[in-house]
């Protein structure tokens, strides 16, 4: 009797992502993987290692350090890279650092442009990368929902959402002119729940900030901001209070809101995800900048 072999949903997503990695490597000469330290980046690196096992990754990791990441993120990054024998490039906008750019006095929009978008463009230009892997997913935000898996960028690293190439089935067009590049998103068809279920299945390590712990929190403009270091200026009457919270998404600590939660394990996070109705990026302050929307940021070069 013939048996029928079927892949589970997670294994289908895994196979698609591995195919995207291998297809991209066959088409591009100088790729790099943007490593943001979050859960999606951890899954992305895990999939890349599977795609090219038993060899080492055929590209380096690139981290854009805005200087305001959570301290736990930087500690995790350094340990993760060492334990997995990875080549990591860390880049910061030195002009922004010299000018003292920060999210408090410059505002989230200008700070993000200088310390993230401009820093990313600097690093990509210096490295002359023709392909950049990223962990963005279509379920995160509406501008990402309409973006291709192979997302074309012009010689200025800018994205034109009205000038996207058709993607038929699993056929990806990587043909570009000199100076142009492609952003590649192997996790495009994954959801936040898929990510956590895969983390559970594969026992992937992630930053502890994703799990509920007592943390020093200031409630500001409806967001729960963690006082991660003494650079956070407190307003009159503000005092950090210990509250049991976790983060669904990670970024710069002054611009990333926590959620109250009791989910202390991956299993409990999966159970929480089955009930939530809010987008994970609803707690990212930079996504609520009005005319500085995510789509506008992406047009200007943001990932």
Curated annotation (Swiss-Prot):
Heterodimer composed of CysD, the smaller subunit, and CysN. It catalyses: sulfate + ATP + H(+) = adenosine 5'-phosphosulfate + diphosphate. GO terms for biological process: hydrogen sulfide biosynthetic process; sulfate assimilation. Belongs to the PAPS reductase family. CysD subfamily. The keyword Protease does not apply. It comes from Akkermansia muciniphila (strain ATCC BAA-835 / DSM 22959 / JCM 33894 / BCRC 81048 / CCUG 64013 / CIP 107961 / Muc). PANTHER family: SULFATE ADENYLYLTRANSFERASE SUBUNIT 2. Its EC number is 2.7.7.4. NCBIfam families: CysD (TIGR02039), PRK05253.1 (NF003587), PRK12563.1 (NF009214). This is Sulfate adenylyltransferase subunit 2. GO terms for molecular function: ATP binding; sulfate adenylyltransferase (ATP) activity. Pathway: Sulfur metabolism; hydrogen sulfide biosynthesis; sulfite from sulfate: step 1/3. It is an enzyme of class 2 (transferase). It comes from the Bacteria. InterPro entries: PAPS_reduct_dom (IPR002500), Rossmann-like_a/b/a_fold (IPR014729), SO4_adenylTrfase_ssu (IPR011784), Sulfate_adenylyltrnsfr_sub2 (IPR050128).
């Amino acid at each position: 009797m013939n048996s029928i072999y079927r892949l589970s949903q997670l294994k289908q997503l895994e196979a698609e992502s591995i195919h995207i990695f291998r297809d991209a490597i066959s088409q591009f000469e100088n790729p790099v993987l943007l490593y943001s330290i979050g859960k999606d980046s951890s899954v992305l690196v895990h999939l890349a290692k599977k795609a090219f096992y038993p060899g080492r990754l055929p590209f380096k990791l690139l981290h854009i350090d805005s200087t305001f990441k959570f301290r736990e993120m930087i500690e995790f990054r350094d340990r993760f890279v060492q334990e997995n024998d990875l080549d990591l490039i860390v880049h910061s906008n030195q002009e922004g650092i010299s000018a003292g750019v920060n999210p408090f006095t410059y505002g989230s929009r200008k700070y993000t442009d200088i310390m993230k978008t401009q820093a990313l463009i600097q690093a990509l230009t210096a490295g002359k990368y023709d392909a950049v892997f990223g962990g963005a997913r279509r379920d995160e935000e509406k501008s990402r929902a309409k973006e291709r898996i192979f997302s074309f960028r012009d010689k200025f690293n800018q994205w034109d959402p009205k000038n996207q190439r058709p993607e038929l089935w699993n056929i990806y067009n990587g043909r570009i002119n000199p100076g142009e590049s492609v952003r590649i998103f192997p996790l495009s068809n994954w959801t936040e729940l898929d990510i956590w279920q895969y983390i559970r299945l594969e026992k992937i390590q992630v930053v502890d900030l994703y799990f509920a712990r007592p943390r020093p929190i200031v409630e500001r403009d409806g967001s729960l901001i963690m006082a991660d270091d003494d650079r956070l200026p407190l307003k009159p009457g503000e005092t950090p209070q210990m509250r049991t919270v976790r983060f669904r998404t990670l970024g710069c600590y002054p611009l990333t809101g926590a959620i109250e939660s009791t989910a202390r394990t991956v299993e409990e996070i999966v159970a929480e995800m089955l009930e939530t109705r809010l987008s994970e990026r609803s707690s990212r302050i930079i996504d609520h900048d009005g005319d500085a929307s995510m789509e506008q940021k992406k047009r200007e070069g943001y990932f």
